Each structure stands twice: as structure tokens, then as C-alpha cells.
Amino acid sequence: MFGATQSTNRMNDFEVASPPDDSVSALEFSPSTVQKNFLVAGSWDSTVRCWEVEQNGATVPKSMKTMGGPVLDVCWSDDGSKVFVASCDKQVKLWDLASDQVMQVAAHDGPVKTCHMVKGPTYTCLMTGSWDKTLKFWDTRSPNPMMTINLPERCYCADVEYPMAVVGTANRGLIIYSLQNSPTEYKRQESPLKYQHRAISIFRDKKKEPTGCALGSIEGRVAIQYVNPGNPKDNFTFKCHRTTGTSGYQDIYAVNDIAFHPVHGTLVTVGSDGTFSFWDKDARTKLKSSETMDQSITKCGFNANGQIFAYAVGYDWSKGHEYFNPAKKPQIFLRSCYDELKPRIN
């Protein structure tokens, strides 16, 4: 799919032009409703940027906006004409790409950690999760939320695949919501992982119905959790993003992000160890491990048809300020990935 453009990447993946000045905190491709591929990235430098991705792998910077604080999440409107941007300034802004205008559409009492578009047959809204311990649902034409749900703790991660939403909170809380008619709590449980979770992603079954989620923790481990497991053994955890050090001890790194392939249903994890790995959860096997980057991988995502995998390389502060090297700049890479993520054939 991609032609030969220059790259400094050891795997010859394609480097995105004009990346942010600080680590990437959010990375989302445009939805399938848009003919071309656009990529949006939010960063700790308080910017959100948009690129057009061409067929040969080249990226064309289209626009950039600066928010009132570090960006923690982004999501696209269902028609691909707008981008919602959640920030540490306690607001969510709507960025209209055609007019290049920005307006506030949501607010919390603390930094907004997650934003997701909910598109059901009877309503469309924006779901926002915050460190103020609330989950809010917004009709973006109105200044007040349609609904506010109090969470037991701060929202750390979330995902939406209609009619399901899932929220991971501080203190290892996991809450599943049904979005049919209106958002209602369906199930609440403690995380199967012993350590703080950082990433969550919903997966679908063969009928394309959302049936569970993958949850990643700072302890190099992922849990595959079905909402209603046919067999308790369907739920399992696996180790990842670990290396055996010279002394024989294991170095354990955080799972920073998880994404499911939109066609194959296989998944990718990215970590503080500077690698990504492709997995087949049904065969319970690893499909591929990447080379190790010289910094952590902070975020990742697939484009709508599953041809392109994007991942962001940058420091995630997992080793504290003494390991921060200002000479190492953030980078975003694109990889042609469709065949590599095909499920294992038994």
C-alpha cells in the first residue's frame, strides 16, 4: 500500500511529518464515513494536529490547534467533519475541520481524561470521563449534560462500541454500561489485574456485536474479559511488555494502549518498553513483536479499513525525570499491517 518514502525507523515504517513537541496522548484515524485517511493526534504540548495520509505513506499536515492545557483524548464525530478534544483545562472542545473553528462543548470540575462519540439509532451524544469522578453525556448543541453519572473514583480509561461502554477507574474499578435507549449501568466489578489499569478496548464477536474488553495494566499484563462469558475460562490474562534483564530478573513495563483490528478482530498492545505486539486472543497466541524503539510507545490505532497501523513514540515518564532526554523528540509512525494481523489459522 505504501510506496518508498524515507524513514529513520528500524522497521522502515513511515514517519509522520511535523509531529508534536511533546509526547502523544491521543491518536485517532478518521471514521469510515470519510473517503480519505486523516489522522489526529493530541499531545502533552497542548496541541491537537491533523494530517492527511496519502496512499504512498506520505503525510500532509493539514491544521493544528492549541488547547488551554495538555490534551488527554480525542475522538471524531461520526461523519468525520469534526474532532472532539479533551484536555487538562477541564473542557472538551469541538474542532470543526472545515471552518477550522474551535468551540467548547463540555466541561468538568477536573481534567477530562476520555471523550467518545456515542451513535445509536435513537440518539447521538458525546461521552466524557473525568478525574472529577463523573461520566457525562452531552448533546453538543446544549451547554448542559443530558446525563451525569457519578463514578466511584477518577476515570482512567474508557471505550465505546454501541451499545456498550466501559470505564476503568482508579482503585481498579471496572464498570460496563448499556447505551440502548439511555446509558444505564449494566455491571460493576473489580479489575482482574492486581495493578493500576491504563488502557481499555472493547472487542466484538463474529456477528460484530461488542462482547467484552481487553484491559491493560502498568504491570505488563492484559486481561481479556467477556461481559457474559459462556465459560468462566473464557476470561484470561496474559503477560506482555516484559524483558529478562542481565541479572535474570524480569523488567516489567506498562501497557500504554490497546487497539483491536477493525476487520480481523486481533489486537495490538504498545508499551513503555518501546515495542508493539500483535496478538490473536482467540488462539491465545502472539502474532508478531516489533523491534524496540529508543523511547516508549504511548498510543496506537488502526485506520477504518485496517490497512494502516499508527503508533506514537515518546517518553511516558515511566522512569521519572532523570530519564527524560530533551534531545529525543516524539515521533509518529505508520505501518502497513493488514496481513500481519490476520488471525492464526489452526
Curated annotation (Swiss-Prot):
Ranges: WD repeats? 17-61, 64-105, 126-148, 255-289
Which tissues is this chain's protein expressed in? Head (at protein level).
The knockout note for this entry states: Larval lethal. Larvae die at the third-instar stage. RNAi-mediated knockdown in the testes results in male sterility likely due to defects in primary spermatocyte nuclear integrity, meiotic chromosome condensation, segregation, and spindle morphology. These defects lead to a failure to complete meiosis but several aspects of spermatid differentiation can still proceed, including axoneme formation and elongation. RNAi-mediated knockdown in the developing wing or in the proliferating cells of the developing eye, reduces their organ size.
GO BP: any one term: RNA export from nucleus
Give the UniProt entry's GO cellular component terms: cell periphery; chromosome; cytoplasm; Nebenkern; nuclear envelope; nuclear pore; nucleus; perinuclear region of cytoplasm
- Output the Gene3D superfamilies linked to this UniProt entry: YVTN repeat-like/Quinoprotein amine dehydrogenase
Pfam entry (one): WD40
Q: Where are the transmembrane segments?
A: none
Major subcellular site: cytoplasm
Q: Could you list this entry's UniProt keywords, alphabetically sorted.
A: Cell cycle, Cell division, Chromosome, Cytoplasm, Differentiation, Meiosis, Mitosis, Nucleus, Repeat, Spermatogenesis, Transport, WD repeat
Kindly indicate whether the keyword Methyltransferase belongs to this entry: no
Q: Where in the cell is it found?
A: Cytoplasm, Perinuclear region; Nucleus; Nucleus envelope; Chromosome
Keyword Nucleus: yes or no?
yes
Q: Which GO terms describe its molecular function?
A: RNA binding; ubiquitin binding
| Protein function | Probable component of the nuclear pore complex (NPC) which regulates the nuclear export of specific mRNAs and promotes cell cycle progression during mitosis and male meiosis. Acts with Nup98-96 to promote the nuclear export of specific mRNAs such as Moe, however it does not appear to be required for general nuclear mRNA transport. Essential mitotic and male meiotic cell cycle regulator with roles in many aspects of the cell cycle including chromatin organization and condensation, spindle assembly, chromosome segregation, and maintaining nuclear structure.
Assembly, per entry: Interacts with hiw; the interaction with Rae1 may protect hiw from autophagy-mediated degradation. Interacts with Nup98-96.
Recorded hits in PANTHER family, A to Z, give: MRNA EXPORT FACTOR AND BUB3
Tell me the protein family, please: Belongs to the WD repeat rae1 family.
Q: What is this protein called?
A: Protein Rae1
Tell me the gene name: Rae1
